[in-house]
Amino acid sequence: MRESEIVLDFAIQVRRALELQGFQVVQTRQGNENPSFDDRSATANAQRGAVFVTLHISSTGLPGTARVYVNSDLLPVANSNGLIPWDRAQAPFLGLSRTFGDLVQGFLTQRFKGSPDAAQTASVRQLRTTAAPAIAVEISSVTVEDRAELDRMAPGVADAIGRGAAAFKPSYIVPNTPGALP
């Protein structure tokens, strides 16, 4: 089994679930091309009011479970010019990422017994350079003998991400009011 093919299949379903919730989706990877992490982050960071979700199929963990990771704490860096270093773009969003991650993890736990109750922290390369609430969703496990076991998880994972994003939106997106400055 190729992890990249399975992830793309999951991504299609996640996209549909998010669109059903009314979200516009921009994918940073659409096929077997392999954009760099920096290119993916640049695409994500160009969006306004966005959240970032990266999907992975792990080779570890209890098969049939799913985990959400948020970036570990990033120590603040004081730059005299006021700019945030690229590899610390996530720092201002850590609290929002935790909230988003916990919501998605709660929905995953309802679907996949044995999954953790809350998002976990890890140093995830792709999240560090993302200037938006960002989570990594990891599905276990690529080591299953029958790919159909993973394929059966895709709708539940997609639904959990869609529902989590919808639940998170009010805490992140402030609606515009007529006459107010954006």
Give the positions of each predicted feature.
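Active-site-proximal helix/loop segments of hydrolytic enzymes
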Residues: M1-P182
